[in-house]
Amino acid sequence: MIKNIFFDMGGVLVPLNKERTLNAFRSLGIEKFADYLNPYLQKGFFARFENGDISAGQFRDCVREISSDNNITDEQIDNALNLFLDPLPAEREAMLRELKEEYRLYLLSNNNPISFTHINKEFEQNYGYQFKELFIEMFCSYKMNMSKPSEKIFLKALGIAGANSGETLFIDDSPANIEAAAGLGFITCLYDVEKPFTEQVRRALANG
């Protein structure tokens, strides 16, 4: 019986727009930001940023180092990065509120402080309450200094939540993350970004 749901954020709760953010970085003199940006797991200094190994300031300095324009501002970098994320859709917000009445909801996300701050601010502007109110706990890679698909982050999250993996549904769009969670006994749902959110979640809960 499913008691807990662990949601990924980017690609599951929040739609991603990779091309839009790559175009924004190109306008800042960075032609190869795609070498670092991945919908599932970042690379290079971006991976270190999401793992909490470097600060937002250090991340921005790394961006400037690969740009043809060393004078780009913090705001320009943040805005370009945040274009990767669409707002959380209304039907997903409504379903999370509904699920919260029956299940213990958690966020388990490879994330960074720039994007996470942006999502929280945008969510509150759109819905009038804080994103964190939907969840028992929000597990973010940059705060935990560990990232999916490492088993460590799953085990740490389960321990903090006091949850049993066999009673926990994990929803993610990354096959590697799903494989890692399944190996630890989670009930899993490989999310398809081309299919409706509510339909996939309801099916996963029914099958679990």
Q: Where is each model-derived feature located?
A:
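Asp-based, Mg2+/Mn2+-dependent phosphohydrolase catalytic module
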Residues: 1-3, 113, 119-208
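N-terminal helical cap/lid subdomain that shapes the substrate entry/recognition surface
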Residues: 2-90, 101, 112, 203
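A generic structural motif
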Residues: 102-104, 186
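Alpha-helical elements of Rossmann-like donor-binding domains used by nucleotide-donor carbohydrate transfer enzymes
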Residues: 20-23, 44, 58, 62, ...
